[in-house]
Amino acid sequence: MVIQETLRLYPPAAFVIRAALEDITFKDIMISKGMNIQIPIPILQQQCDLWGPDAHKFNPERFAHGIVGACKTPQAYMPFGVGPHVCAGQHFAMTELKVILTLILSKFCFSLSPGYQHSPAFRLVIVPEHGVTLRVKTA
């Protein structure tokens, strides 16, 4: 649940780009066939109407009943993209992440330094704008 919530708030990629397959009108916007559409994943995954009033807060419990229970529209959860262009390495990345976290957390304890300033910067990938200073102790 913690990994899913982290990926919801801080997805590996900031955008998904898709080409419209046909002419379509969305609200008052005309989208022509072939037009590229950028989907800002971090914004989509923090919409209060989809994720609830605490959409901007870190709340791993929202995934207690899986993605279907976390979001009104499960397709809005797309940290690795969606559809035929989904990241081919997503399952490997999740397995690797779980193994590495298990190894690291079994040997070390981490805490943020008092001067830490939370500042995600949305670039090609999301990075901490001012870096992250951690205190590390052996477990």
Residue ranges of model-derived segments:
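Cytochrome P450 heme-thiolate "Cys pocket" and heme-binding signature region
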Residues: F63-L97, P120
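Amphipathic alpha-helical interaction motifs in eukaryotic regulatory proteins
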Residues: I3-L7, N59, G81, K98-S106
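Cytochrome P450 heme-binding "Cys pocket" and the immediately downstream C-terminal segment
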Residues: I37, Q90-V127
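Conserved cytochrome P450 K-helix E-x-x-R motif and the immediately C-terminal K′/meander segment
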Residues: M1-K27
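Conserved beta-strand elements of beta-rich interaction domains across eukaryotes
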Residues: N36, I43-L44, P84-H85, V99, ...
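C-terminal helix/juxtamembrane-tail motif
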Residues: P42, C109, V125-A139
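Conserved cytochrome P450 K-helix/beta-meander segment immediately N-terminal to the heme-binding cysteine loop
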Residues: I39-V68
